[in-house]
Each structure stands twice: as C-alpha cells, then as structure tokens.
C-alpha cells in the first residue's frame, strides 16, 4: 500500500475536485450539503451528533480500547486488534435454527407482527446465509420493487456476532416490507431512517441474548461485542465524516500530497493521540 500512496493520493485529489466542481454547479454551500439532503437531515443535527460523539471519545472508545488491550495482554492495541475476539470467548457455535429462533422470539416479545413479517424471510427462502465459494463478503438487505419482497444476504458462521448481523439485516427487511406499502415513489428511505430500523432489531436480539447469559464471562463477551459494534457503527463513522470534511476543506486550497492526506486521517482518528 505504501508503494501505491501516490496513486491513492491522485484518486483522492481527483474525486475531491470532481465533487467540488459538481457542488459548485449545483450551488451547494458546503461539501456536506449534498449528503445531508440525500439523508433528509439538517446540518445542525449532524453537527450536534458529531460534537457529542467526539466529546465522548475519551470516556467511551478510548477507555474501551485501553480495557481491551489489557484483556489481550498488549501494551498498545493496533488497529488490527480492534475487533479481535477476547481470549475468554467461547468457541461454541450457534446453529442456524437456533439463531432463527433467537431473533424471531426477540422480535415477538416486542411485536408479534414484526416477528411474523421476519418469519417469512425464513419460510419463503428470502435469505441467502450459507458461506459459498465466490460469494461476496459482508451482509445486506436489498429491496427490489414494492410488488416483490426484499432479499437478505449474509455469511452465517455461527458466532454471536453473526446472530446480531442476522437480527440487524432482518430489521432492514421488516422495514422494507412495511415501507413497500407506501408505493414505489415513497418506499425508499434515507440511511438515517433505514439504520434506525436495523439497529433497533439488533438491540432487541442483543437484550434477549444478554438476559439469557448464564455466566459473567458470557455476559462480558456479549457486552464487549456490543461496545465494539457501537464503536464501528457510530464512532468510526464520525471519524470518517471528520476525515472527509477535513480532506475537502484542504483540497479546496490546492492539490494534496500523500503526507497531507495522511495527516488529515491521523488528525481525525478516534484513537488516543498522546
């Protein structure tokens, strides 16, 4: 990657300049305006969220990273250790049928209707969960048209995190089924709303798993996984947002060198900078 940093710098410079030109043509007042419009959110709301998350870096993400480094026996936790499993994590796997029952029962405790909608994804084969050669990594829920059901894709390996992923994507799926009732023009939703539905479904399942934990060790692993999930969902995204804001502001002053781009990323990192 180091050998290609000039290429990466050229890509960043080109994309940032291309956006600046389009924003100027569209009379966008800031580089962020277009994204705020597509997300149906006011700039003031985003800024308030950003400030609250950044203010919480030391007492949340920094504190957790220090704890995890201690648990892993590390003096300094590197970025590749961020999502590493804890040494006390159980190797026991959760089979697909058990995962289905966990998610559906968690949904049913909140809303039987929500569980019934989610159940269709299993009974009608709307989910592709098996790991297969050539299959794309990751997970997503994808609507098609309002007259056809959505699909869920994930790679289920049987870990508790995979159960959380299933619950997350089914949250999207249930939302997409219900949104289809609004018709083709109104069923599409911005990310801000879509992720609210998915994280809500995930939290329902997490609370059920936590309540069912039999040992302090099991609770610790679940809670650590949830903290890491929230750091990935919220803290990391704010760091990306800050990096992009700083990058576009710097690019407006002229072409950037690899070192200048690296400095933008280092400055906005949510990790401690002692």
How should these model regions be labeled?
Residues 1-2, 267-274:
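Conserved small/polar residues in nucleotide/adenosyl-binding loops
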Residues 4-151:
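Contiguous, non-catalytic segments that form substrate-binding/exosite surfaces or channel walls
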Residues 109-116, 142, 172, 176-183, ...:
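Conserved helix-loop functional segments at active or binding sites
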Residues 153-166:
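Short pre-active-site segment immediately N-terminal to the catalytic Zn-binding motif
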Residues 165, 169, 173:
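Catalytic glutamate of the conserved HExxH
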Residues 176-197:
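Post-HEXXH active-site segment of zinc metalloproteases
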Residues 191-215:
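Post-HExxH zinc-binding segment in Zn-dependent metallohydrolases
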Residues 207-266:
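Long, well-structured alpha-helical subdomains associated
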């Amino acid at each position: 990657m180091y050998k290609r940093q000039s290429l990466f710098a050229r890509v960043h410079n080109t994309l940032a300049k291309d956006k600046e030109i389009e924003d100027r043509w569209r009379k966008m007042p800031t580089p962020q305006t277009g994204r705020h419009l597509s997300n149906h959110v006011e700039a003031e709301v985003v800024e308030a969220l950003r400030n609250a998350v950044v203010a919480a870096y030391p007492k949340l993400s920094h504190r957790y990273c220090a704890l995890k480094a201690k648990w892993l026996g590390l003096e300094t936790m590197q970025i590749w250790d961020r999502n590493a499993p804890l040494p006390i994590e159980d190797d026991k796997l959760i089979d697909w049928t058990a995962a289905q029952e966990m998610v559906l029962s968690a949904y049913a405790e909140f809303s039987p209707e929500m569980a019934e909608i989610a159940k269709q994804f299993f009974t009608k084969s709307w989910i592709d969960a098996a790991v297969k050669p050539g299959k794309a990594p990751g997970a997503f829920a994808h609507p098609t048209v309002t007259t056809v059901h959505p699909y869920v894709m994930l790679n289920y390996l049987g870990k508790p995190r995979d159960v959380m992923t299933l619950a997350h994507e089914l949250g999207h799926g249930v939302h997409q089924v219900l949104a289809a009732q609004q018709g083709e023009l109104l069923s599409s939703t911005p990310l801000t709303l879509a992720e609210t539905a998915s994280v809500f479904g995930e939290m329902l399942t997490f609370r059920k798993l936590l309540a069912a934990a039999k040992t302090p060790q099991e609770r610790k692993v679940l809670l650590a996984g949830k903290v890491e999930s929230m750091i990935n969902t919220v803290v990391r995204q704010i760091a990306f947002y800050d990096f992009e804001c700083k990058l576009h502001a710097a690019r407006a002053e002229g072409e950037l060198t690899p070192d200048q781009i690296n400095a933008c990323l280092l400055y906005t990192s949510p990790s401690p900078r002692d």
